[in-house]
């Protein structure tokens, strides 16, 4: 990370990570595809109604993993073995605690949260059951994201891909078994996902327990070191809050979608799968950006940090533009993976026609946030994100309230990404100039 061609190294680092991110998304995609094809559109709508809640809570856990990634990268770049070990063992405890807390919240309040989102009464029972079962896998997700963060900071993105590939295949097979054979519908796919999450967590932990370098986990060394705890939380909590704040703002979008009929809700659920798929391909370059900048920040190489930002931004924009364009061309075929009813596919295309042009522009926001996190700045970007979400809420109560069309609801994404992207780029530029190496 601190030497060699950045164009080549960032791409080679990102490709396995991209595969890992996409496979993680495929856990939920396989849920939606199986219930859409082998259950009915009611089950599809029920699973789709939980998407933003799942995104909210998994975003918090992913944020913690991102904090671990950057802090470990800082210590590795500075060649601080003791600091690396303390960060790793502290982080494992913090992530496990976070996963348990998220699980408890989901188990206790899923029904109330889904009601606040105006989930259709006919979808409610299956949606609540799906959410509660899926929540049981949250502790495992937290542990996996911890391990992924550590390995990515070390430059190893291949092992997480292998582990998720194994868990992903098992997830799909269990989905088919529980839905087709056991007729469990939404509950079946949630159970399959929870089991797969524990398999991926177990695989990554077995590897970390067997490592021989400074990234090895020893159960006897598990404790909360104050300095490492503070550093990880200062990076992880704001990052998790960024994900959570966006998810909360998106609850207004889901509430707006839920005000339409069940066909529109199901079409939106099918099309929204493209969001997570494309975003996570782009997210691989953001993780690379934070990891490479983090190590070079620890090594004191300012020029290489700036070049990392530019290259990561370029890769992410190209990926978003290509994938968005492909989705515009092959949207109906993509949607047919998750739904069979023509009306549902038509409703999904309304979202795709707008979002396909929008994805690439989100990179200015997200890559700049990752770059700021790489230099240890995570609180101001979170405040900027909060402002962006206020904009989304205002849009919901003004533009959408005026037009009352599904298109006016979807357009808020590109406008909020543009405004936030400008602010995040400006903040990183100012912060970078103040760095002394």
Regions flagged by a language model, labelled:
Residues 24, 28, 32, 36, ...:
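Juxtamembrane/transmembrane-helix interface segments of polytopic membrane transporters
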Residues 65, 134-152, 160-168, 189-204, ...:
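Short runs within selected transmembrane alpha-helices of multi-pass transporters and secretion channels
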Residues 44-104, 141-160, 267-331, 362-384, ...:
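Small-residue-rich hydrophobic transmembrane alpha-helices
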Residues 1-14, 72-139, 181-237, 293-358, ...:
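Short alpha-helical transmembrane segments in multi-pass integral membrane proteins
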Residues 17-70, 134-141, 230-295, 316-323, ...:
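Transmembrane helix-bundle signature of multi-pass secondary active exporters and lipid flippases
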Residues 26-29, 38-41, 75-78, 153-154, ...:
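Helix-loop interface residues and adjacent transmembrane-helix termini in multi-pass membrane transporters
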Residues 17, 21, 33, 70, ...:
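Transmembrane alpha-helix boundary and packing residues in multipass membrane permease domains
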